[in-house]
Amino acid sequence: MKYKLFRSPGNLDKAIRKHELVAVEIGKNIDDVADALIRAVRDDLAEMPEYAHCETAAYAPEPIQEHRRVIRYQYEMMGVVYPQYAEKNILIDYGVIEEAE
């Protein structure tokens, strides 16, 4: 299976055409590529100039939640940016498309 990772500029359900392809991973199932997708999210956030000098993290892919309106993605992920001097962390939505090779 092929897994395409997209970063959302805001809410995962909105502005679908503005989502950016971040990575493509190949594996037997989502569990096989989960670590690579987590690394891709962390690297993507770390490379963004506005998040320079910030720590980053990512949650493992999960099936799209029922409240989501987007039908393009089969899985969703959350990237987290930990600014050094801020009251709140920054959360970034990612979507994952699963397709046959």
Task: Mark where each language-model region is.
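A short, exposed loop/beta-hairpin motif centered on an aromatic-Gly-Thr core
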Residues: 17-32
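Hydrophobic beta-strand residues in large extracellular and virion-surface proteins
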Residues: 3-5, 25, 33, 37, ...
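Short, mixed-charge low-complexity intrinsically disordered segments
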Residues: 39-101
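Intrinsically disordered, low-complexity coil/linker segments enriched for acidic/polar
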Residues: 8, 27-29, 87
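Short aromatic-glycine-(Arg/Gly/Cys) micro-motifs in beta-strand/loop hairpins
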Residues: 1-20
